[in-house]
């Protein structure tokens, strides 16, 4: 199968192509979506911070215009990345997710973290460079584990105070230096709900551009202990029957995939497809 979207480092001095614009309120869009003819978009009165060539969509080059402030464009509005995730065009979401990660990284690395001098984009490479320090900075990716813990026909789900009201999800957490993904899983489960797990199985991964996580999905079986929610992190955690689940995360998330996959296998239903 031919991929419609492929990432690439493109020369911003070349003409043509499509462009997306990102500002403090998300991405610019109109009735046709978030992709605009690049020459038209660059002709608007936009507070341009930087431009990045990010890849090809259906063979056409795509660029990101990173803005320093909100701008008003006739016939257009602004929409956050999560809203695009929930809509039907998954390819567009992948384009915008990558654009958001590159834009955030470049914005946060305009100055050298060692000497404080301005950094420059490296031609032909996705890197920012400080010549006095001979320091290259590459896009940040933060490895995180996410795990569905099961006990027969029951699954353990939890609520963070930051979740939408009523929604429960799987446990997750960032890996620390020196940890494997499995080490991270065991530690996070102990910290968040005070139980032990066994038979840890890797399921799949998902890029999660909020802002730069790589979610490593696992399934694990309950091994022992009583649920004690971590103060300030877990509002509630409990076992739910696969026949009576609470409101769940968005269908595009790997958290939802882990849940749906286990439920499908327990009930003999068709297995879902892992979101890209």
UniProtKB/Swiss-Prot annotation:
Catalytic activity: a 5'-end NAD(+)-phospho-ribonucleoside in mRNA + H2O = a 5'-end phospho-adenosine-phospho-ribonucleoside in mRNA + beta-nicotinamide D-ribonucleotide + 2 H(+); NAD(+) + H2O = beta-nicotinamide D-ribonucleotide + AMP + 2 H(+); NADH + H2O = reduced beta-nicotinamide D-ribonucleotide + AMP + 2 H(+)
Record-listed E.C. numbers: 3.6.1.-, 3.6.1.22
Motif Nudix box location, chain numbering: 173-194
GO BP terms in the entry: NAD catabolic process; NADH metabolic process; NADP catabolic process
Pfam (any one): NUDIX
Cofactor, free-text remark: Divalent metal cations. Mg(2+) or Mn(2+). Binds 1 zinc ion per subunit.
CDD domains reported in the protein's UniProt record: NUDIX_NADH_pyrophosphatase_Nudt13
PROSITE patterns: NUDIX (PS51462)
Binding site for a divalent metal cation 2: 188
Chain sites annotated for binding a divalent metal cation 1: 172, 192, 233
Enzyme class: hydrolase
Cofactor(s) recorded in Swiss-Prot or TrEMBL: Mg(2+); Mn(2+); Zn(2+)
Binding, substrate: 82, 125, 138, 206-213, 255
Entry binding sites for a divalent metal cation 3: 188, 192, 233
Single GO MF annotation: zinc ion binding
Record's GO cellular component terms: cytosol
Domain of life assignment: Bacteria
Family, similarity comment: Belongs to the Nudix hydrolase family. NudC subfamily.
Stored PANTHER family: NAD-CAPPED RNA HYDROLASE NUDT12, NUDIX HYDROLASE, NUDC SUBFAMILY
UniProt subunit comment: Homodimer.
Protein name: NAD-capped RNA hydrolase NudC
Gene name, Swiss-Prot/TrEMBL: nudC
């Amino acid at each position: 199968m031919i991929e419609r979207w492929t990432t690439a480092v493109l020369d911003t001095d070349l003409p043509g192509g499509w462009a997306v614009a990102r500002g403090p309120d998300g991405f610019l869009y109109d009735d046709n979506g978030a992709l605009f003819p690049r020459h038209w978009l660059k002709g608007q009165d936009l507070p341009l911070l930087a431009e990045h060539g990010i890849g090809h969509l259906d063979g056409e080059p795509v660029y990101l215009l990173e803005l320093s402030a909100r701008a008003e464009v006739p016939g257009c509005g602004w929409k956050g990345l999560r809203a695009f995730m929930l809509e039907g065009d998954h390819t567009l979401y992948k384009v915008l997710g990558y654009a958001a990660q590159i834009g955030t990284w470049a914005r946060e690395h305009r100055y050298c973290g060692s000497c404080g001098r301005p950094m420059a984009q490296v031609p032909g490479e996705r890197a920012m460079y400080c010549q006095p320090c001979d320091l290259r900075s590459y896009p940040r990716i933060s490895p995180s584990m996410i795990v569905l813990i099961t006990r027969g026909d029951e699954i353990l789900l939890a609520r963070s105070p930051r979740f939408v009201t009523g929604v429960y999800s799987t446990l997750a957490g960032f890996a620390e230096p020196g940890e494997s993904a499995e080490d991270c899983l065991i530690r996070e489960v102990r910290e968040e709900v005070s139980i032990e797990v066994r038979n840890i199985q890797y399921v799949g991964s998902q890029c999660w551009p909020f802002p730069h996580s790589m979610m490593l999905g696992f399934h694990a079986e309950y091994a022992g202990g009583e649920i004690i929610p971590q103060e300030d992190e877990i509002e509630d955690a409990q076992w739910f029957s696969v026949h009576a689940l609470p409101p769940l995360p968005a269908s595009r998330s790997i958290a939802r995939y882990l849940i749906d996959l286990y439920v499908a296998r327990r009930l003999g239903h068709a297995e879902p497809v892992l979101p890209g």
